[in-house]
């Protein structure tokens, strides 16, 4: 069998989804109620990084980019993550705040997609979270000029040790280039895998002060 033949075998990789369906009658009026339930179940199932989510942005040319970050807070105002403000994603958000989030809970045969606008968090919110992080993580935030090219990992490690020595006394200050974003909740889609590829998809879409719920074809 040639290498090409082996690669083509991926076309046959599939399985049935058997974890159960999602029915309209079981949906709460508020999407965050269902999100909280699903997130809790993802945590109870001991999934690796259940709060990991894909953040999709686009640059000024319309080129999409994706990366995984961790959800750090959520409420009716939106979903929060933190990042280096000099990063590619931060620059792209400043240029175009419309983003999409995706929670890929494969083991539970579920995914949740969020569409909304990202806005910068206040310095007070950022500082409160920053000082709740492990000390080494705080120092790590100072080390990297995110998305810039570097010649070797050793540069980062040396910088970390240098800053660890510098900040050994007292609190680690909040870097001016480190912050967070809150993504508003305009649309939230819940996907549950189904047998015979008849998946269940429900879209919550905000209309004024209420949520409209539609079932989508798989």
Swiss-Prot record:
Q: In which pathway does it act?
A: Cofactor metabolism; pyridoxal 5'-phosphate salvage; pyridoxal 5'-phosphate from pyridoxamine 5'-phosphate: step 1/1; Cofactor metabolism; pyridoxal 5'-phosphate salvage; pyridoxal 5'-phosphate from pyridoxine 5'-phosphate: step 1/1
Q: Where does FMN bind?
A: 67-72, 82-83, 88-89, 111, 146-147, 191, 201
Q: Which InterPro entries match?
A: Pyridox_Oxase, Pyridox_Oxase_CS, Pyridox_Oxase_N, Pyridoxamine_oxidase_dimer_C, Split_barrel_FMN-bd
Residues where substrate binds: 14-17, 72, 129, 133, 137, 197-199
Q: From which domain of life does this come?
A: Bacteria
Instruction: Kindly list any coiled-coil regions of this protein.
Output: none
The answer, when asked if Zinc is one of the entry's keywords, is no
Keyword vocabulary terms for this entry: Flavoprotein, FMN, Oxidoreductase, Pyridoxine biosynthesis
Q: Does the keyword Flavoprotein apply?
A: yes
Q: Which cysteines are joined by disulfide bonds?
A: none
The cofactor remark states: Binds 1 FMN per subunit.
Pfam families named in the record: PNP_phzG_C, PNPOx_N
| Cofactor(s) for this UniProt protein | FMN
The entry describes its oligomerization and partners as: Homodimer.
Task: Fetch the PANTHER family from UniProt.
Answer: PYRIDOXINE-5'-PHOSPHATE OXIDASE (PTHR10851:SF0), PYRIDOXINE-5-PHOSPHATE OXIDASE (PTHR10851)
State the family named in the UniProt similarity comment for this chain.
Belongs to the pyridoxamine 5'-phosphate oxidase family.
Q: Which NCBIfam families did the record assign? A: pdxH, PRK05679.1
**Task performed by this protein:** Catalyzes the oxidation of either pyridoxine 5'-phosphate (PNP) or pyridoxamine 5'-phosphate (PMP) into pyridoxal 5'-phosphate (PLP).
User: Known HAMAP family for this protein?
Assistant: PdxH (MF_01629)
The protein's name is Pyridoxine/pyridoxamine 5'-phosphate oxidase
From which source organism is this entry?
Escherichia coli O7:K1 (strain IAI39 / ExPEC)
Task: Write the gene name.
Answer: pdxH
